[in-house]
Amino acid sequence: PFTTSVADSMIIGLHIEDNVYGPLYFDYLADLDPDDPIMAPRNLFETWINQFAPETVLVLVKASPDAIRNRMAERPHKAGVVQRGDIELVLRRFEEEFQRSALPNKLVIDTTDATVEESVAEFTRRIGPFLTDRDRDRMDSIDADSG
């Protein structure tokens, strides 16, 4: 969000991931209320995003606990953070942070029964209402150049 008006950005995690994983796995932010004064700098992220990049869309990508367990078993990450016993808690915490967020543009993609390709296609279909006129003009220009 802190880029020029010409660039596009994708930020994954940022303060929300910190708020979820920090207390659970990295021994920081534990036992702090979201309104605790020490959280003020983290809470400012959304103020800055709303001020400097109001077109930002917060996307919650989720799946059922069983789907996540199956994916963890089938394709384990070498440096995976989430522990099997914490899946429900992590899902709940991401949902809470998503609902609590002051970012007005929000989208939920449930990948429980979808492939990666299907999830990307769903995102592509559903992001439309959040695109600016400038975004659409740029996309039309790219389509014209490639066609």
Residue ranges, per PLM feature:
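A glycine- and Lys/Arg-enriched "phosphate-lid" helix/loop adjacent to the NTP-binding pocket
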Residues: 21, 25-41, 48-97
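Conserved beta-strand scaffold positions in the cores of enzyme catalytic domains, especially
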Residues: 8-10, 56-60, 106-109
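Short alpha-helical segments and helix-capping/turn motifs at coil-helix boundaries
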Residues: 1, 43-45
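Alpha-helix initiation/capping motif
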Residues: 13-14, 83
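Conserved substrate/cofactor phosphate-moiety recognition/catalytic segment
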Residues: 1-10, 16-24
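NTP-dependent small-molecule kinase module
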Residues: 74-78, 85-147
